[in-house]
């Protein structure tokens, strides 16, 4: 079984996130989504639009998502969450490149394939 993991704030979730999730699901047999926690959201934006439990429930309800968790990380990365899940693939959206992400170090260490550029940047949650 090929396990795929993706991550995001989904704060708020928008059509670009749906495309990202749908494309990620096509990469493997099971898709696990890491939802960045409220602490990470505050680090990035100063505050959350929606709290982590609401964002998690919305993500879990999406048909292509097999499982979703709240990130266990305390910084702006999902490195510890990736280490916990141990996916075969870690995928990023169209606005991220694998050379730019801090998660590339843990993925390389664990032999996890990184795929970037899933979908186009259709929207940005920071516009809301």
Task: List each language-model region with its residue ranges.
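Nucleotidyltransferase catalytic core that binds NTPs
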Residues: 1-128
């Amino acid at each position: 079984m090929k396990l795929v993991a993706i991550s995001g704030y989904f704060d708020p979730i928008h059509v670009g996130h749906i495309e990202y999730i749908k494309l990620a699901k096509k990469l493997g047999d099971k898709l696990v989504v890491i939802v960045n926690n409220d602490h990470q959201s505050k680090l990035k934006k100063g505050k959350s639009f929606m709290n982590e439990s609401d964002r998690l429930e919305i993500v879990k309800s999406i048909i292509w998502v097999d499982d979703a968790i709240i990130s266990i990380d305390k910084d702006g990365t999902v490195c510890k969450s990736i280490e916990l899940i141990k996916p075969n693939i870690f995928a990023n959206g169209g606005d991220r490149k694998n050379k730019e992400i801090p998660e590339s170090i843990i993925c390389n260490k664990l032999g996890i394939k990184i795929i970037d550029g899933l979908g186009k940047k259709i929207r940005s949650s920071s516009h809301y």
